[in-house]
């Protein structure tokens, strides 16, 4: 039986990344209500007490962007500067321009149109190159993988308890993570559940853990997938060791993937401090990595590009293979 683990995470409405997403999409929605053919490339960044809105927008609509920003921040739950930002009092900086004429020309008159196509769907060109991929699976009614759906449901449940007032100490920011164990590609059990939530400083961690275990996890995760080996981490930032290591060789390995995972755990220290030490990450190496990729850069002699453990791993794999062959031979003689 082949055992694998897969982890997915979800962030809550008040997570800075998600807050920025909601503001950008809220601006888009407001513009589309007035101008369905507007072109909106809106980016948002957030810091303590500050929201910046920038990008390129071409529209005939007139929307009050600062008002939209403040409304969304307050709706998410940031109504006090002690939370990190207050929608009523924060600064909102706007740096918007019209869409680039070159991009506008390509979008407004596609290559197919210029070549003579009169198909209505051919008239609008893409504004940039794009790569898209996706898939559907049978693990959930939503045709999505189980780990991400459970992570989303956990995040929604925490937000629900915050908004209803049942857990009044909760604040808008947070993150959830679920690790699912698979056996031969099928869901077997839950290996780990992580819930991290922003909260009032007067509440101790034990109270939060008890509430998450009592009110959130049982309401979301099927009991049959939980067992006494399932690990629960509540506000667990600071855990050093990875929950799991997964290897996929696409049936090219001479050794089982489980044994390869054991060798990786044995010979590669994946704790943050060890990664920093082994890859010498406290040196000023980063500017050279900003362009042309972090991998496949032999001219930079990057520590993570070295294959100095390849021979060691090959020797151990060979020894393990020999041991397995000897065991099979002995078993055959015994028969």
Give the ranges of each region predicted by the language model.
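Short, hydrophobic beta-strand segments
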Residues: 50-56, 191-199, 243-249
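Short, charge-patterned binding micro-sites
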Residues: 40-59, 237-240
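Structured, hydrophobic secondary-structure cores that serve as assembly/anchoring elements
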Residues: 5, 12-18, 44-47, 233-239, ...
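A structural-propensity feature for long, helix-poor, extended segments
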Residues: 51, 164-186, 234-261
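Internal helix-turn-beta structural module
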Residues: 236-335
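A glycine-rich helix N-cap at a beta->alpha junction
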Residues: 64-85, 113, 192, 207, ...
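Glycine-rich, mobile lid/loop segments that gate access to catalytic sites or pores
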Residues: 7, 74-232, 291, 295-321
